[in-house]
């Protein structure tokens, strides 16, 4: 049975005839030559001939319809080793280097990919397989020029498109990279998402109609028409597209510009077998149109495996095989590992190439043998020749006019504004929940403080209610902003990194789109609570109050933006927020008399929007309350006699009202500018 | 299905779990914005399981296969009696109907998502659980031995002293398996044991299961390792005979010859140790729901159950499945994983009209009458095993509380980093407050406002820190509680008491530290006694705040919901604390607020013995002359016993919150199944 072969292979045993000549010599050199013979003369496993030219390659929109052959050679990749306590050791090293004039104490590195070669042809679906840790994703990242920080691609490695060496920028124009985790704005529909992508991704000269036509075409191609009006959703929170549909949508956004080369990292992870099949089918369809498709895959099922044109097997950072699946059968049976019947070949190869815990040495030996065998096979030698000869093939066309961003500033702005507006309208957490919450809280406060009279107790309560306005507006808006803004930040980071739009267009579009909401919330709140409590009557007083509350809402929104741009995650922002707000709250003059603020902290109180707003609102409420309007019993010395007295005991003066408006306005502008700078810094640093 | 005859002869009596006509309904949830109309509408019910019948014998390793939504997990939970709700049908063991609590004794359920205490090491975790799961008279040495055996058996010996959070997915899964094996159950239910694991880990998990099921163990250590001495009061000849042998005789019989080669070569190290299990005479039976098994994993199963749309399409030996399919014209292609093929055939709705229905018809025809008539095994077996199970005694309640407290403390200590960060934030707030209020001097009218504000901030900070801290932690712990309480590991009350008790020292520590920073800056003129009494009160309010936090999170059951819906509650409590408004404006409501008690007591302590406050120069301005007037102005009580009354009230409020939330947690646990 086939299992026996496998067993023998894993054991490294020598009972099987076909495995014999691999193991016969305990002296390595003899076996090497033996294998060399076997491969060089008798058998040619793996072909490097490109497949027959695709039939209907011109069916796209006519732009960039070139076919690309992507070859890579001698790729050596090193990664930083994460040692326990290495941070401290590095520091010690660095200081020692500083003092002892030893500048270069190299950090330990790990050899992730060892001399990896390969080639992908147009019209071909190439699957990179291997057990976890074999270096699939590392290779893919390197091929897409998107290696994360700390990974070094050695300069000896070559990456050639149609025989021409490429750099990151040229690659970006031609290659679409679909990452394993897809990020979307959950409240949009699939179609809206694609239209946005079309606005910012496609070349400048196209009209809106052409873009929409392309979107329709892509929707058809990737069979998304059924779900194009479904909202994308957030996994686990908002029901929306299914996993397979999300994946196809991610392909669709990349396919809009019709790139000739498509690289996908684990497109099927997390999908059940049928969805996975449909996703790979879509990729297959794309490849049949003349595109070059490379994907990594962990455990393909049997049917999935049949769809691949070529497979690239990796083990321990080396290439174990590259060629068609049928060649793989030959190759592996040649090295002594015959795939049993009724056994998924993919499972089998991955298993043969896996490092079994507890038997590391054996497994490594086995893998090394297979890789050596492949390295001296015909394929590898063909590859050398190919690299030597193909250099003169047709040169690459220059990418379109060389703009960093595909869309103009104004188009980017319009697109971002449009998308943000849609997401504001559709995000229930923003609009529906916020308005309901505001209404409820306003009614609640109104009921508790219902109909205050101007008595000694009433004065206390009114002052409390006014301060409650401020705390409520602040905390509600800060947290709402943090929650919504930080949840969208990953999408921004990825899109900014792909150069879809500029940082400033995003920030401007986003904040302008959210503005109407932050005008409505204070309006609703004030309109309900103000009359219920029975604050100072009069239209002017009401609008004064409304203006101040609206300003406070916007200051706190700006502050929320600042915090979310400056902190690394949602939970970080949420836990940093309150401790930072508390000093401002105390300077408001309610919990701490503004006369008692220590001198050395006075400057800080000019940053407190609570102070400006509290002063403004109290002036609005008390400035024109005449002596006698407050009903005090004559004997009571603790009762304030007039509005003026109240303001004086709180150390506020009625003349400062204009200053308060100005202070709030300045705070809004400066917080936003700071937030923008923080966002920009962050987008830069991540690159 | 038919091999039972051979095996029962050698390895002790065979146990057979049988289930008949299992049906499970859930209310059909239609999407509508108006929940009221949903209530009024006649409830439709969705049938998730339809007449599922079948059986498993010791020695079987069964895979439940099916597409997403086929009802795999539901079937598993239904057989193991872990399902709450509308379940009909019978589950019997050798002809004896099994109740829920009996099932939890003889079986284990390995959930899909591993829920462990992440900061323990593998060894600690198992040793800890062995206290709960083994008989109360088991000695420490025996527990240690058992844990060491289990670690060896699941191949975790090298990782025994690694924290769980640093283990890989496969290692965690195997650890969960080891945890389930502490009680040495006969029946193992595993929900998707391979999901999320790489191929080798997945293989080793199933391999371990296979070993547990198909190896035969002739003799073993004495039974009292798990079941304690007193379960042998009625010794039946067999068990005492095997128990008397001080050295166990281990013998493994390779069950079927054809698997020998593949198995010996891929043998996991030291699986043999599992033969040391107390119920050694019994082989085990395991049943797994599994999603897309790879070829090598699929070959390990002795039986498969194919499901489609809540019905069993096929159940039987793995080898016979291919024939079953071939008979109907579904030919298994070469080089294709049979599992993939079966699933694809079932899902292929476009080809011939519904393969699933055709297959099911054939299956039902073949097994006609097998499950509809009498039980497969008549009521003959009442062996020692069940007797031991019934004699099982858990550890005492108070010991459970103690162990759980140790667990909480250890967890907190291991998480010292995040604890320190939280504490750092807390201290930053304290320092900020003390800086801001450092300008207070003398006793003037301003001081009245400032001290009121500072006291409000003190109680505010204590209460919110603790209630929110709990709201973030507690919902994450709910699944663990539900599972462990549901499995009968410990009682809910023990858990709850331990939880509350573990918070008390933290509350006192933080309360006094927080206060001392501020006290040093603001109230330092007032002496040490005031410090002690204020700190005591703040700590008490922190304890009450824990109750409030647990109440909120058990009311809403998720931290997101809790923090969103808590806002109105917080607002009301805050307002009636007395700083924003005079507490007597709306009579009576103040007694609901934690803030009121804590504010009142702090204000009382500060102001009660002050009898001279400076008046402003301007005669028009209002002037408060004594501390008592300050209290009167805020409508605070100023009787002699006010402070102690408030302390007492805080304790009462805390107790009420805890009782209510205990009830809520209990309802939550009883309402939903815990698989």
From Swiss-Prot, chain A:
Protein's name according to its UniProt entry: Protein white
Self-association and partners: May form a heterodimer with bw/brown. May form a heterodimer with st/scarlet.
InterPro entries tied to this protein: AAA+_ATPase, ABC2_TM, ABC_transporter-like_ATP-bd, ABC_transporter-like_CS, ABCG_dom, ABCG_transporters, P-loop_NTPase, Pigment_permease/Abcg
Family of this protein: Belongs to the ABC transporter superfamily. ABCG family. Eye pigment precursor importer (TC 3.A.1.204) subfamily.
Catalytic activity: 3',5'-cyclic GMP(in) + ATP + H2O = 3',5'-cyclic GMP(out) + ADP + phosphate + H(+); guanine(out) + ATP + H2O = guanine(in) + ADP + phosphate + H(+); riboflavin(in) + ATP + H2O = riboflavin(out) + ADP + phosphate + H(+); (6S)-5,6,7,8-tetrahydrofolate(out) + ATP + H2O = (6S)-5,6,7,8-tetrahydrofolate(in) + ADP + phosphate + H(+)
Species, as recorded: Drosophila melanogaster (Fruit fly)
Ranges that cross the membrane: 420-440, 461-481, 498-518, 532-552, 569-589, 645-665
Stretches of the chain found on the membrane's Cytoplasmic side: 1-419, 482-497, 553-568, 666-675
Signal peptide: none
Tissue-specific expression: Expressed in the head (at protein level). Expressed in the eye, specifically in retina primary pigment cells, in the basement membrane of the base of secondary and tertiary pigment cells, and in retinula cells (at protein level). Expressed in the retina underlying lamina in the epithelial glia that surrounds the array of lamina cartridges (at protein level). Weakly expressed in photoreceptors, specifically in terminals of R1-R6, R7 and R8 (at protein level). Expressed at very low levels in medulla and central brain (at protein level). Expressed in principal cells of the Malpighian tubules.
Reported effect, residue 590 to G: In sat; 96% decrease in drosopterin (eye red pigment) levels and 21% decrease in xanthommatin (eye brown pigment) levels
Positions of glycan attachment: 636
MF (Gene Ontology): ABC-type 3',5'-cyclic GMP transmembrane transporter activity; ABC-type guanine transporter activity; amine transmembrane transporter activity; ATP binding; ATP hydrolysis activity; ATPase-coupled transmembrane transporter activity; guanine transmembrane transporter activity; L-tryptophan transmembrane transporter activity
Segments forming domain ABC transporter: 93-341
NCBIfam families xrefs: 3a01204
Topology with respect to the bilayer: Multi-pass membrane protein
Organism placement in taxonomy: Eukaryota, Metazoa, Ecdysozoa, Arthropoda, Hexapoda
Main location: membrane
Swiss-Prot record, chain B:
Membrane topology listed for this record: Multi-pass membrane protein
GO terms classed as biological process: aminergic neurotransmitter loading into synaptic vesicle; eye pigment precursor transport; guanine transport; sensory perception of sound; transmembrane transport
KO phenotype (gene knockout): Eyes are brown due to a defect in red pigment production. In Malpighian tubules, guanine uptake is impaired. Reduces the levels of several metabolites, including kynurenine, kynurenic acid, 3-hydroxykynurenine, guanosine, xanthine, urate, riboflavin, and tetrahydrofolate, and increases the levels of guanine. In the head, levels of neurotransmitters histamine, dopamine and serotonin are reduced; specifically, histamine is reduced in the retina. Severe loss of white protein in the retina lamina and photoreceptors.
Domain of life: Eukaryota
Transmembrane segments: 420-440, 461-481, 498-518, 532-552, 569-589, 645-665
Domain ABC transporter: 34-261
Induction record: Up-regulated during aging in intestinal stem cells.
Reaction it catalyzes: guanine(out) + ATP + H2O = guanine(in) + ADP + phosphate + H(+); riboflavin(in) + ATP + H2O = riboflavin(out) + ADP + phosphate + H(+); (6S)-5,6,7,8-tetrahydrofolate(out) + ATP + H2O = (6S)-5,6,7,8-tetrahydrofolate(in) + ADP + phosphate + H(+)
Locations listed in the record: Membrane
Entry-linked Gene3D superfamilies: P-loop containing nucleotide triphosphate hydrolases
GO CC annotations, alphabetized: plasma membrane; presynapse
All ranges on the Cytoplasmic side of the membrane: 1-419, 482-497, 553-568, 666-675
Classification via InterPro entries: AAA+_ATPase, ABC2_TM, ABC_transporter-like_ATP-bd, ABC_transporter-like_CS, ABCG_dom, ABCG_transporters, P-loop_NTPase, Pigment_permease/Abcg
Enzyme Commission code: 7.6.2.-, 7.6.2.6
Keywords annotated in UniProt: ATP-binding, Membrane, Nucleotide-binding, Pigment, Translocase, Transmembrane, Transmembrane helix, Transport
Function: ATP-dependent transporter of the ATP-binding cassette (ABC) family which transports various molecules including bioamines, neurotransmitters and metabolic intermediates. In the eye and probably in association with w/white, required for the transport of the eye red pigment precursor, guanine, into pigment cell granules. In Malpighian tubules, involved in guanine uptake. Probably in association with w/white, involved in aging-induced intestinal stem cell proliferation in the midgut by regulating tetrahydrofolate transport.
Family the UniProt entry places it in: Belongs to the ABC transporter superfamily. ABCG family. Eye pigment precursor importer (TC 3.A.1.204) subfamily.
Description of how the protein assembles with itself and partners: May form a heterodimer with w/white.
Descriptive protein name: Protein brown
